[in-house]
């Protein structure tokens, strides 16, 4: 049902936009520079390794390595000392967004990141820039570029803004030594045939620790005022991620197009942390393997409102799903008990738990895996939690986090319609053939 509805919507409208008079809300107050309100459009997403001549094993190995690096960044955000000058953000990711910037429009690609807010790309003049496949953006060559004054509310929305000649300056660190520094400005961003003026973004002139062929910047999709959804004043977006190795692009729908998608049950309540308000925390009550409800106290997944520890976030950029250690060990042991196949070392491919598959594949029985959310039970398809990096091997696409926070990763979300509705504080899920025409 959801798959056919999703395909119908994509066939109906590749790109849709409607403009209406802005209305006065606290969010649109931050968007006072916009003359019209964008209510809906689509963006195509490509996997960062799409089109590369890589084997399935190499694709998984690279994705897990990126995911592990991202996990370290996320954990650094939780453990960063208060009052530091440079804030730490998630960065990195698995899906690229193709867009253009400036007038005339100059194409570039950027990571879609639900774990951070800032939109940024590399800019000239560059003190330190990494290689990118498209020319580095030169704001002096764009008739629609403006610098952002220090008095701007979106400048003040930065956690550690600085000021130089009344120009707003930013520094974003990513926990592993990667960092982008530069000036804040406003510019026209173009998605397909849709051009949106006066988007606030970071013009990165000193960018260290990036440059692995993964785009020329980042588009923050988090919950803060600097993110793309917040600047567009949309409270809904959805994506449908195609599997790793697929040549078919994924789709991101914002605003009214996402409003048109009814994902239905199951769903989960969104929670916002006062310590890290960017993240999309969800409400998970328990896990089941096969018919066994695991003896995991719901507090293992609860966000501590006092100090911001714990909880589980849904994230587009982390490859595997990570549970706090006691929950993960319970999942791990139950799969070992129920699958009853030889356990083999999968560390060379980045997995903690792998099994040797029987010579006759029909003898392989994979237990079901269910996530018990407060708004219903999500039973994942087996290919979303067991994957085969090579012949004769299947591996659990999960791991253990060390800092008390769990992460619902993107392998578990593949071929699934995921709808974020911040207006109603809910995330919904529905099975779908992502990328189907």
Curated annotation (Swiss-Prot):
GO terms for biological process: proteolysis. This is Aspartic proteinase nepenthesin-1. The gene is nep1. Belongs to the peptidase A1 family. It is found in: Secreted. Extracellular proteinase found in the pitcher fluid of carnivorous plants. Digest prey for nitrogen uptake. It is an enzyme of class 3 (hydrolase). GO terms for molecular function: aspartic-type endopeptidase activity.
């Amino acid at each position: 049902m959801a798959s056919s509805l999703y395909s119908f919507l994509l066939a109906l409208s590749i790109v849709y936009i409607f403009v209406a008079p802005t209305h006065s809300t606290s969010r649109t107050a931050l968007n006072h520079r916009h003359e019209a309100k964008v209510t809906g459009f689509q963006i195509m997403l490509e996997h960062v390794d799409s089109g590369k001549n890589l084997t399935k094993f190499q694709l998984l190995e690279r994705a897990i390595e990126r995911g592990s690096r991202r996990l370290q960044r996320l954990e650094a955000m939780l453990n960063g000392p208060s009052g530091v000058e440079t804030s730490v953000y998630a960065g990195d990711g698995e899906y690229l967004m193709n867009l253009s910037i400036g007038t005339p429009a100059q194409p570039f690609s950027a990571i879609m990141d639900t774990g951070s807010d800032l939109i940024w790309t590399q800019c000239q003049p560059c003190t330190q820039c990494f290689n990118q496949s498209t020319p580095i953006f030169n704001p002096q060559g764009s008739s629609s570029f403006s610098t952002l004054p220090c008095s701007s509310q979106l400048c003040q929305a930065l956690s550690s803004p600085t000021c130089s000649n009344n120009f707003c300056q930013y520094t974003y660190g990513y926990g592993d030594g990667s960092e982008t520094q530069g000036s804040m400005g406003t510019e026209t961003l173009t998605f397909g045939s849709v051009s949106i003026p006066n988007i606030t973004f970071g013009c990165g002139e000193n960018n260290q620790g990036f440059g692995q062929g993964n785009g020329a910047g980042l588009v923050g999709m988090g919950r803060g005022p600097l993110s793309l959804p917040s600047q567009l004043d949309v409270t809904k977006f959805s994506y449908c991620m195609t599997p790793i190795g697929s040549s078919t692009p994924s789709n991101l729908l914002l605003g009214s197009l996402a409003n048109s998608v009814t994902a239905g049950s199951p769903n989960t309540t969104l929670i916002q942390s006062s310590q890290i308000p960017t993240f999309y925390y969800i409400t998970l009550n328990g896990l089941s393997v096969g018919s066994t409800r695991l003896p995991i106290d719901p507090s293992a997944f609860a966000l501590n409102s006092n100090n911001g520890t714990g909880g589980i976030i849904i994230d587009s950029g982390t490859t595997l799903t990570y549970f706090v250690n006691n929950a993960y060990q319970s999942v791990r042991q139950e799969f070992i008990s129920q699958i009853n196949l030889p356990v083999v070392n999968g560390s060379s491919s980045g997995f903690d738990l792998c099994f040797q598959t029987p010579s006759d594949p029909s003898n392989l029985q994979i237990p079901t895996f269910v996530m018990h959310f407060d708004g219903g039970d999500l039973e994942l398809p087996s290919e979303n939690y067991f994957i085969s990096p090579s012949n004769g091997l299947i591996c659990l696409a999960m791991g253990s986090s060390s800092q008390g926070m769990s992460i619902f990763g993107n392998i578990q979300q593949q071929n699934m319609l995921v709808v974020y509705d911040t207006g109603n504080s809910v995330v919904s899920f529905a099975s779908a053939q992502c990328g189907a025409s």
